Amino acid sequence: MSFRKVVRQSKFRHVFGQPVKNDQCYEDIRVSRVTWDSTFCAVNPKFLAVIVEASGGGAFLVLPLSKTGRIDKAYPTVCGHTGPVLDIDWCPHNDEVIASGSEDCTVMVWQIPENGLTSPLTEPVVVLEGHTKRVGIIAWHPTARNVLLSAGCDNVVLIWNVGTAEELYRLDSLHPDLIYNVSWNHNGSLFCSACKDKSVRIIDPRRGTLVAEREKAHEGARPMRAIFLADGKVFTTGFSRMSERQLALWDPENLEEPMALQELDSSNGALLPFYDPDTSVVYVCGKGDSSIRYFEITEEPPYIHFLNTFTSKEPQRGMGSMPKRGLEVSKCEIARFYKLHERKCEPIVMTVPRKSDLFQDDLYPDTAGPEAALEAEEWVSGRDADPILISLREAYVPSKQRDLKISRRNVLSDSRPAMAPGSSHLGAPASTTTAADATPSGSLARAGEAGKLEEVMQELRALRALVKEQGDRICRLEEQLGRMENGDA
């Protein structure tokens, strides 16, 4: 067996995480202490939102991404709820609209000013009332404008048309116990849910029917999570009967057995999965952990491939994930997380090391853009549509530090080169020959440059030969290793 086949090839094997410098963090934020397994954080290309401690009700902070450093205690908040805020979610089709769910049993939708808050925001644009217990889950539809899902501790899932404040669908008989989380599929035709009864369900919200169900997806009693992947499979996190944390991958067509099941460790914190459909990488963050593990999902067994772990010193109380269109593609950034500490928010950048300054097509396929593919009425009528994709190539900015600059200015003359007679036709390259270039000194200068160039070329040829020699040697060693493993040597 060749060693090349033993080590799985992946362009994400060398992804590494890097926290930003202290002056790029958001300091002195009083992160909420409410007991709820939410991310407590939501981010988009314009704003960072964090659920914070508030007296006399619930509040969350909305900061422009550029508002780093220490945040003044008097900085205005969004503070219209009468009970603690449990979950927040930015609208995928409008970077200035955010929804929140609260212990006061309401869902509120807020319009954030273009440049951020200058005074406390107490009046939502829409109040959605329909739950009888606290609302802990908020999820916008991925492709239909103004469609919002909410789930409460009354075990009810409601689908809303935010534009009309109308309750579109009420699903009140599908969950016998507390709902831990919900996740829309790629086009928003279905959603999956994880429930306290240990079941994972796939639900058609417009029909109000159960499409598939897996009882005891994870046998442990602690909270679990379920998310849809782009190809329709379901990824879950949970606990075993012995309280070991687990990951699993399921095929909705056959939920009898998981396609893959992995055990991680014996920590207590719930595992929060963040999925990137463009790269098929799942990032798993444990509440109370100080690490982020990431895995690549493939179509071949064993399906879930561990890539690496980012580890820091401080435990995380929550986590937000930047949408792909908010990343710095010129730095080969494939993910950015916003880690909540006790009193600050720290961005963590995930990067694929690349030597080339060119746009990396393989890292950045077309991704979901901010334009809705459907109106709410179209979705209600039964239509489905995939997200409208955009290219990130326009966001690419070449690194100025690596630009090659060549100057041929003559050190013997500050005068501009004279144009040769008859050489001024449109579009022709301007001549850079000067009178000084024709002198013996100019000839020597050019000869010196040519000599240096030849030295560089010789060194480059030698390096290429060395690389080829090393490559051949590696191949020979791999063949020897393969023969030894097969018992031939």
Curated annotation (Swiss-Prot):
UniProt-listed InterPro entries: Coronin, DUF1899, WD40/YVTN_repeat-like_dom_sf, WD40_repeat_CS, WD40_repeat_dom_sf, WD40_rpt
A Gene Ontology molecular function term of the record: Arp2/3 complex binding
Region spans: Disordered: 408-444
SUPFAM superfamilies xrefs: WD40 repeat-like
PTM: Phosphorylation by PKC on Ser-2 regulates the interaction with the Arp2/3 complex and cell motility in fibroblasts. Phosphorylation does not seem to affect subcellular location.
Pfam families: DUF1899, WD40, WD40_4
GO biological process: actin cytoskeleton organization; actin filament branching; actin filament bundle assembly; actin filament organization; cell migration; cellular response to platelet-derived growth factor stimulus; endothelial cell chemotaxis; negative regulation of Arp2/3 complex-mediated actin nucleation
Annotated protein name in UniProt: Coronin-1B
Organism classification: Eukaryota, Metazoa, Chordata, Craniata, Vertebrata
